């Protein structure tokens, strides 16, 4: 990868602007999950240890450009960052035209989405950002799929543009999983709709050895194979697409194993009566809400023999206890597997937390939309810009 790495640079006495993803949930001024702040600390500490004058910025929510509001302010983040770093972290409100910061100090620059032109990747604004620093560090993988002034434009104009440790760890893990995977490569793609994961399925089917589909996506594939799905969530108009994906897999010698048993209910409710049925016994008024125990075991065996596992999406309605066993079985199989494993997506991370397997998954992507776009085979604007600067 041709990207300059922050870890390789001499930052002594340099003004370093770091774009982090500090977009944390805040309720009544209280941060409810500080994972992203905690994740940013090693990068900031490293820059300080290298003797840099450090400026950090991030977006928070979706404020209106050109107007400051308390609810969109990074003030609570500055307070928490100071506590984690053990140093003062002043919040600078008006910073586009210049920032006072000395080597060994760190300042937090107010929500960059408040700046006029940020969202449209305005060149004038990007050049102003670039003029603030000697080195720009992009460390926000979660926004790498957005071409904005603080994630893309500034990379073009900064004297030096580098990838930060968080961003590079994410790119290294994804490259290891997709570009040069230990075989067999198994992907789990689940979600409510084929339509939202169509590009993902179409890209992965050309790379994987096994593709496990789950949730509403699986129902469409089950229907495509000629089985009844009752009143389960599915997309009949995408049956030809599902058949094409299966045909593409077959042509490569890859496999899309379908469930042989499922867990059904008559209503979509947490306390609905759950029944395990073989796939050919699904009634017209049944809702398929999870994979059955035999299927879960079969999938777990595939995971056990995989060299690489990419996991995006729970295979059942795991929020409801009666329909969580399929997802739990696969989660525990991934945890005990020797495979290189990468998990990403909001619901997937919730499942990782629920079954407490974060330590056992090789790499957990916090990228969200950027993670999905990478899996879809798309070029992320920030990554492309960093690669262009690294040539």
From Swiss-Prot:
Family per record: Belongs to the phosphoglycerate kinase family.
Matching PANTHER family: PHOSPHOGLYCERATE KINASE, PHOSPHOGLYCERATE KINASE 1, CHLOROPLASTIC-RELATED
Localization annotation: Cytoplasm
Keyword set includes Translocase: no
A GO CC annotation given for this chain: cytosol
Keywords: ATP-binding, Cytoplasm, Glycolysis, Kinase, Nucleotide-binding, Transferase
Subunit structure, interactors included: Monomer.
Chief localisation class: cytoplasm
Catalytic reactions on record: (2R)-3-phosphoglycerate + ATP = (2R)-3-phospho-glyceroyl phosphate + ADP
Biochemical pathway: Carbohydrate degradation; glycolysis; pyruvate from D-glyceraldehyde 3-phosphate: step 2/5
Domain of life: Bacteria
UniProt keyword Transferase, yes or no: yes
Enzyme class of the recorded protein, top EC level: transferase
Recorded GO MF terms: ADP binding; ATP binding; phosphoglycerate kinase activity
UniProt record, GO biological process: gluconeogenesis; glycolytic process
Listed name of the protein: Phosphoglycerate kinase
Coiled-coil residue spans: none
């Amino acid at each position: 990868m041709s990207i300059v790495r922050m870890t390789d640079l001499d930052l002594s006495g340099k003004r370093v602007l770091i774009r982090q993803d500090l977009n944390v949930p805040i309720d009544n001024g209280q941060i409810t999950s500080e994972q992203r702040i905690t994740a940013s600390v090693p990068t900031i500490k490293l820059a300080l240890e290298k003797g840099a004058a450090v400026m950090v910025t991030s977006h928070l929510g979706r404020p209106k450009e050109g107007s400051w509001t308390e609810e969109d302010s990074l003030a609570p983040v500055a307070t928490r960052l100071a506590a984690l770093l053990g140093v003062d972290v002043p919040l600078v409100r008006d910073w586009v035209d210049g920032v006072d910061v000395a080597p060994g100090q760190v300042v937090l620059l107010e929500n960059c989405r408040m700046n006029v032109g940020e969202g449209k990747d305005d060149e004038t604004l990007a050049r102003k950002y670039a003029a603030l620093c000697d080195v720009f560090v992009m460390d926000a993988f979660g926004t790498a799929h957005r071409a904005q002034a603080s994630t893309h434009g500034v990379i073009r104009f900064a004297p030096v543009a580098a990838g930060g440790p968080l961003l590079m760890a994410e790119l290294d893990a994804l490259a290891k999983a997709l570009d040069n995977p230990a075989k067999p490569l198994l992907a789990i793609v689940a979600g409510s709709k084929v339509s939202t994961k169509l590009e993902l399925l179409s890209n992965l089917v050309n790379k994987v050895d096994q593709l496990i589909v789950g949730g509403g996506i699986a129902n469409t594939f089950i229907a495509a194979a000629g089985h009844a799905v009752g009143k389960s969530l599915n997309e009949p108009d995408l049956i030809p697409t599902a058949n094409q994906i299966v045909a593409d897999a077959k042509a490569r010698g890859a496999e899309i194993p379908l469930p042989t048993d499922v867990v059904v209910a008559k209503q979509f409710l947490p306390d609905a009566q759950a029944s395990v049925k073989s796939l050919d016994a699904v009634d017209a008024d049944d809702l398929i809400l999870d994979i059955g125990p035999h299927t879960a075991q079969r999938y777990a065996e595939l995971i056990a023999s995989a060299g690489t596992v990419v996991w995006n999406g729970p295979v059942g309605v795991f929020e409801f206890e009666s329909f969580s066993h399929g997802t739990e079985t696969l989660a525990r199989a991934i945890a005990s597997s020797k495979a290189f494993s990468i998990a990403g997506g909001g619901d997937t991370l919730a499942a990782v937390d629920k079954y407490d397997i974060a330590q056992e998954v090789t790499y957990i992507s916090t990228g969200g939309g950027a993670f999905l776009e990478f899996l879809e085979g798309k070029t992320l604007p920030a990554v492309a810009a960093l690669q262009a600067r690294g040539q």
